[in-house]
């Protein structure tokens, strides 16, 4: 650790760590509240919605992939996926060339649920979105969080960022389709 100690002081390290911790906690609290309000009408919790979202964008993802990208333990991903299967939103499968891993895919009902939730996004207040509008007005776009992504890449690895980018590209590509589909009556 001699090299690390030469690059920064203990004071700098502690101030940085505490700053990140406090800002992350404050932001997460707002994100969590917004997310819970958005999905409440669908009787889902955040883990369940996240699994549906990941399954939608990473078609045929393994439980391990869902856990990794969902930043949850494999048993958490499996148990919540099981609940979603019982509700008819997910189906489990094994692959002939990979019997060790369990894969999840959305059912038609799961896909329809994701589409409906996306259509109803603006039916609830989103404090994080509202809090970012001044930056969008000033710079013409929402923040990219490139420095945060660099830190996440160093913590979780390139695979995590690749999955993140791939899923968001799929979301961008499919957004028009989501808007065109009829709303499901629940």
UniProtKB/Swiss-Prot annotation:
GO molecular function: DNA binding; DNA-binding transcription factor activity
Matching PROSITE patterns: HTH_MARR_1, HTH_MARR_2
Source taxon at top rank: Bacteria
This protein's UniProt keywords: DNA-binding, Repressor, Sporulation, Transcription, Transcription regulation
DNA-binding region per UniProt: 63-86
Claim: Repressor is one of the keywords in the record: yes
Domain HTH marR-type: 13-157
GO BP, sorted A to Z: negative regulation of DNA-templated transcription; response to stress; sporulation resulting in formation of a cellular spore
UniProt-listed Pfam families: MarR (PF01047)
Subunit (UniProt): Homodimer.
Function per UniProt: Negative regulator of protease production and sporulation.
NCBIfam families: PRK13777.1 (NF010349)
Listed name of the protein: HTH-type transcriptional regulator Hpr
Biological source species: Lysinibacillus sphaericus (strain C3-41)
Classification lineage: Bacteria, Bacillati, Bacillota, Bacilli, Bacillales
